[in-house]
């Protein structure tokens, strides 16, 4: 039982937020799907029988069903953006302080771009200046063949931004394997403090973290903290456009049926672009482009949150539209 309110939620309450209840999330928010041990597994209202993503999958279901216009979520590796992509809604991971290798940002899921801007206190500009837009279709953190409809959506979005007057260029993976290896170790180290029984995946991370020595710990923090500079050095662009998911949301139970190691790696294959923005501390936004099966991901490298939302508005069309089930 909690003994105090999280500072982020306390600020929301002080500003008049109404919190009707708590939604389902996986154990410690450590998976990109929402199948908590011993509890019901929320279904994806836009693709019944398939995962709504995670870790904020329960919140995404509430928003996608229209039960609430927005819901609190957190993002330590894509946990706002992945559920948004799975359920046809809008998810924004704000820029955050990555001090001491912190990957987590607090934010919201929302049904429309207008609602997302409102809850994130962003004023969407009527127009944005000409920007340099990098297009990344190469997976960053895993090798995977990306589904054709995901790639086609990014291609059409890039064309739309070019027609809107932006300079659009292809970019390549910005770094090698070391940053994600560091992220994996950071998750493992953060799991060491988990007491008692845990799910197979969390137990595996905890055991793995307990074997990481002090020298390696210092090295992974240094590597993690260098990601922002690596990204900015690699790409001379203002905004990054990429897919969010490599393939459609899989059936409920798909990941959990695997060994913990395969589970972790396959989740990474499914979402190979998300974690980079957690390590870099940069803002990123996911929304449905054209239809719920083609979510796209735009990240702010050298622009403000308002400008990022402005770019999204160019692609989103009517910012008050809501995907109907």
Predicted regions mapped to residue ranges:
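Short low-complexity, flexible loop/linker segments enriched in glycine and/or proline
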Residues: 34-38, 85-88, 181-188, 257, ...
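Short amphipathic alpha-helices in soluble, non-transmembrane regions
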Residues: 311-315
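Conserved small-residue hinge/capping positions at short loops/turns
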Residues: 1, 18-21, 25, 133, ...
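Amidase signature
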Residues: 122-271, 279, 317-325
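Hydrophobic/aromatic ligand-binding patch that stacks against planar heteroaromatic rings
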Residues: 11, 60-62, 160, 275-278
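Short, well-ordered beta-strand elements
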Residues: 292-310
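Residues within well-ordered alpha-helices
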Residues: 7-8, 32, 58, 157, ...
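Short glycine/serine-rich loop segments
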Residues: 5-6, 13-120, 283-295
């Amino acid at each position: 039982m909690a003994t105090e309110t999280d500072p982020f939620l306390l600020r929301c309450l002080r500003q008049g937020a109404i919190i009707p209840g708590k939604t389902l999330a996986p154990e410690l928010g450590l998976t990109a799907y929402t199948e908590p041990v011993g509890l019901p597994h929320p279904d994806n209202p836009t693709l019944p029988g398939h995962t709504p993503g995670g870790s904020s999958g329960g919140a995404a279901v509430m928003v996608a069903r229209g039960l609430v216009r927005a819901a609190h979520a957190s993002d330590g590796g894509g946990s706002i953006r992945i559920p948004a992509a799975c359920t046809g809604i809008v998810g924004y991971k704000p820029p955050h302080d990555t001090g001491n290798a912190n990957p987590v940002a607090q934010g919201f899921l929302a049904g429309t771009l207008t609602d997302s801007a409102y809850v994130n206190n962003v004023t969407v500009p009527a127009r944005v200046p000409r920007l340099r837009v990098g297009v990344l279709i190469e997976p960053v953190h895993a090798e995977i063949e990306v589904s054709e409809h995901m790639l086609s959506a990014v291609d059409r979005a890039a064309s739309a931004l070019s027609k809107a007057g932006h300079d659009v260029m292809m970019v390549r993976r910005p770094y090698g394997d070391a940053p994600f290896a560091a992220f994996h170790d950071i998750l493992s180290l953060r799991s060491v403090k988990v007491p008692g029984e845990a799910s197979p995946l969390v137990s595996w991370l905890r055991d793995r973290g307990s074997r990481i020595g002090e020298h390696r710990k210092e090295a992974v923090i240094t590597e993690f903290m260098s990601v922002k500079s690596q990204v900015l050095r690699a790409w001379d662009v203002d905004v990054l456009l990429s897919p969010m998911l490599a393939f459609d949301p899989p059936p409920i139970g798909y990941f959990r049926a695997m060994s913990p190691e395969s589970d972790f790696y396959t989740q990474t294959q499914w979402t190979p672009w998300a974690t980079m923005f957690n390590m870099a501390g940069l803002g990123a936004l996911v929304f449905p482009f054209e239809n719920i099966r083609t979510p796209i991901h735009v990240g702010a490298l050298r622009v403000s949150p308002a400008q990022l939302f402005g770019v999204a508005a160019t692609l989103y069309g009517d910012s008050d539209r809501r995907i109907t089930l």
